């Protein structure tokens, strides 16, 4: 397994403290990797800053060609990446290979094309004798912090737009799941000029802080928790860096009486528990109208009970383990607190799986109330709650009564209601009669404490640029 850092076009061993990397399906240590030292963090940023002098002036075509080459090598090594992601994250191998790798390849290919479509406003004379033009230029060095739930996917979401816009990047994957990012570094070093992409390994305190606080870093992009986002925003405030934050979610799933219940059950069974529920957009907070509530709880409970947890190598496995022992304990604690309320009923699941690995049973909780912690706080595991509501006004207010604002869905056959409710929901994305669908052409990002800035789409590309005005006297 590739375990070296990429700094200035060279693969080098870390000079800091060694950290274990686990296989969450067994609890075994896969290997130990040395963190980047403070000197190596500085070297990576300095290399990126030096490379920016030329990379920032390359043509969109040249950048697109590099991104397309990277997409090709990821596709060619898809099985290798899927196996690494499966071993390090516990994802079912078939899901990593069939679902994630094609989407990752598409992200790089999309931004290769988008790089050639980005432009400013046409020139014009807004002052007599002067011509103005608007430029969209790269910022410089971008520090990208990727999470542990989709390590390679999130690396792609961050690298592709930043590079397409002409920036240079220092990427720090989560210390829990670094293996695919390190493999990506190995393949990228022969495609991009030295220093354009740098990949480090280490914890937030030892590597993340010196990276995001470095005076040569002009932008920090984070996908992570609210707490981490708060820390980085305050940590970078003295140097007035641009920040791009995707900080989690608690997606409301609004099911009206007229919804297609079979579609709802199938959708939540899939999209509430995909990746063991470790997804910011997971369909985890159901609001069911009183006329459909009982039937939905019964049918969904039966469907969730059929979800198969097991070895990531088994083709029939639908749910792998959680990412770490610490996270398993957090999920378990959240469910135990829900049980302790007395009014929340466990329909299925509600316990850790026996045996090796960090497995938690797919869980459905009914009878949750709006103010319950299980409704208000992100669990980030295979846990879905169901809350009864009376009418449209009530459920819209409840759905918006959340610190999160990333994703939501509305299930109804009434087209007017679908438009009306979608317009009022305070979420970056609202799906109607589906959930979880993402495409490279459409923006992904939140409101409120879910953060700001967009991933994917041309809006995502624009986030990695600075708008500049050039005026020429004639």
From Swiss-Prot:
Pathway this chain belongs to: Amine and polyamine degradation; putrescine degradation; 4-aminobutanoate from 4-aminobutanal: step 1/1; Amino-acid degradation
Active-site residues, record numbering mapped to chain: 246, 280 (nucleophile)
EC number of this enzyme: 1.2.1.19, 1.2.1.-
InterPro entries documented for this protein: Ald_DH/histidinol_DH, Ald_DH_C, Ald_DH_CS_GLU, Ald_DH_N, Aldehyde_DH_dom, Aminobutyraldehyde_DH, PatD
Coiled-coil positions: none
A Pfam cross-reference name: Aldedh
Reaction equations catalysed: 4-aminobutanal + NAD(+) + H2O = 4-aminobutanoate + NADH + 2 H(+); 5-aminopentanal + NAD(+) + H2O = 5-aminopentanoate + NADH + 2 H(+)
Enzyme class: oxidoreductase
Binding sites annotated in the UniProt record for NAD(+): 146-148, 172-175, 209, 225-228, 280
GO process annotations (BP): L-lysine catabolic process; putrescine catabolic process
A GO MF term: NAD binding
UniProt keyword terms in alphabetical order: NAD, Oxidoreductase
Keyword Oxidoreductase attributed: yes
SUPFAM superfamilies: ALDH-like
Entry keyword Nucleus: no
Protein function: Catalyzes the oxidation 4-aminobutanal (gamma-aminobutyraldehyde) to 4-aminobutanoate (gamma-aminobutyrate or GABA). This is the second step in one of two pathways for putrescine degradation, where putrescine is converted into 4-aminobutanoate via 4-aminobutanal. Also functions as a 5-aminopentanal dehydrogenase in a a L-lysine degradation pathway to succinate that proceeds via cadaverine, glutarate and L-2-hydroxyglutarate.
Family, per entry: Belongs to the aldehyde dehydrogenase family. Gamma-aminobutyraldehyde dehydrogenase subfamily.
Subunit structure: Homotetramer.
Note: 4-aminobutanal can spontaneously cyclize to 1-pyrroline, and 5-aminopentanal to 1-piperideine.
The name this protein goes by in its record: Gamma-aminobutyraldehyde dehydrogenase
Organism of this sequence: Escherichia coli O1:K1 / APEC
């Amino acid at each position: 397994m590739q375990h070296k850092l990429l700094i200035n076009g060279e693969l080098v061993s870390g000079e800091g403290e060694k950290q274990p990397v686990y296989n969450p399906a067994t609890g075994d240590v896969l290997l130990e990797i040395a963190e980047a030292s403070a000197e190596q963090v500085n070297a990576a940023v300095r290399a990126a800053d030096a490379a920016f002098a030329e990379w920032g002036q390359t043509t969109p075509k040249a950048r697109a060609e590099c991104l397309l080459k990277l997409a090709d090598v990821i596709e060619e090594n898809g099985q290798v990446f899927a196996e690494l992601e499966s071993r390090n994250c516990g994802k079912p191998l078939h899901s990593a290979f069939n679902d994630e790798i094609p989407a990752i390849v598409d992200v790089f290919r999309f931004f290769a094309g988008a790089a050639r479509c980005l432009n400013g406003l046409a020139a014009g004379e807004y002052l007599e004798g002067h011509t103005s033009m608007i430029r969209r230029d790269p910022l410089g060095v971008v520090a990208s912090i990727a999470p542990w739930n989709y390590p390679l996917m999130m690396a792609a979401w961050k690298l592709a737009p930043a590079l397409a816009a002409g920036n240079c990047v220092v990427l720090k994957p989560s210390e829990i799941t670094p293996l695919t990012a390190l493999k990506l570094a190995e393949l990228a070093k022969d495609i991009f000029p030295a220093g354009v992409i740098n990949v480090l390994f280490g914890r937030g305190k030892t590597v993340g802080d010196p990276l995001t606080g470095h005076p040569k870093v002009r932008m920090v992009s984070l996908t992570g928790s609210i707490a981490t986002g708060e820390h980085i925003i305050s940590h970078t405030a003295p140097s007035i860096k641009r920040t791009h934050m995707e900080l989690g979610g608690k997606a409301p799933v609004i099911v009206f009486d007229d919804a297609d219940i079979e579609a709802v059950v199938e959708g939540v069974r899939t999209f509430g528990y995909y990746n063991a529920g470790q997804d910011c957009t997971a369909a985890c907070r159901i609001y069911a109208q009183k006329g459909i509530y009982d039937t939905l709880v019964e049918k969904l409970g039966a469907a969730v009970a059929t979800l198969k947890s097991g070895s990531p190598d088994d083709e029939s496995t639908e749910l792998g383990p959680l990412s770490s022992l610490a996270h398993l304990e957090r999920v378990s604690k959240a469910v135990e607190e829900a049980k302790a309320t007395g009014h929340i009923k466990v329909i299925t699941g509600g316990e850790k799986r026996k045996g090796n690995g960090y497995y938690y049973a797919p869980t459905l909780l009914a009878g949750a109330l709006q103010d319950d912690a299980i409704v208000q706080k992100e669990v980030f595991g295979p846990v879905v709650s169901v809350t009864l509501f009376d009418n449209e006004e009530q459920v819209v207010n409840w759905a918006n009564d959340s610190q999160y604002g990333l994703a939501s869905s509305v299930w109804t056959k009434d087209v007017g209601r679908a438009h009306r409710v979608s317009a009022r929901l305070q979420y970056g994305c609202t799906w109607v009669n589906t959930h979880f669908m993402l495409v490279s052409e459409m923006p992904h990002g939140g409101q409120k404490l879910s953060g700001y800035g967009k991933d994917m789409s041309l809006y995502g590309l624009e986030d990695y640029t600075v708008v500049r005005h050039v005026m020429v006297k004639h």
